[in-house]
């Protein structure tokens, strides 16, 4: 399956097993096992996501890297396997400031607080929106708890205490997330490794795709994705990407999942269990990718710049704002908080 917009540069999702992707002139040529072929103009591709047994030829990979296009590799079931990235951007001075702030605990704490505040505010907004029609007292109580957690963010004196606040706020949110779900699917709690029900399976896949979007934006701006402020560096862990991703989790990934479930776009029959782990079936993954891409292209009124732009563009704007704060061009890093 290929998903891409006819006009905008978007993510190219390669999901058809045993496909081969070649490069010819200004196109990627996707050859399917049944001999069908599809031509994709390279000028319309900003990123590539490969799921499972899909082969990209060396010329295709060289062309993508030469154009600065990242390739993300997932397993057939959507687990992250790795990323092929172009050379790091040449702005060494920006990364030097990133490393300096990372080493300064108080400066790093300011960024970490902004990331947590943005996440909790957007989680709370999701609950407030849903409860306009639900009128559920438990959801209302959760919004009060989360407002209390948001107020505590600025009082946190260490990243450790901040993570505790984030954990309490997330627990309140996911404690009532199941009440936002309509229909026969059930959500009781967040289960990451492994996902054992359809909603957790979709949340995990959504977060994986979101992490790739954020990592690609960080690559474009020229920051180091492995040096963060909230998430501490660990071997192979894209800490900065996880930091920036926090404020987008509820308004992109969670929103996609609720849309799919509540409009019965996917049902329990679109999932399969293997060794206690629940996965989306191949056709269901195609649908999920399409809905995720739709959300990235959806526009909103940007709260700081006062113009309409897409969620995909908002991700890059947030990374650029972080870069400007690191270099002292703006006084604060403000997370993207929606209303």
Ranges and model annotations:
Residues 2-24, 33, 39, 90-339:
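Active-site helix-to-loop segments that bind/position phosphate- or nucleotide-bearing substrates
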Residues 22-54:
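N-terminal ordered "arm"
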Residues 44-47, 52-125:
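A surface-exposed, charged beta-strand/loop segment in the N-terminal or early-internal portion
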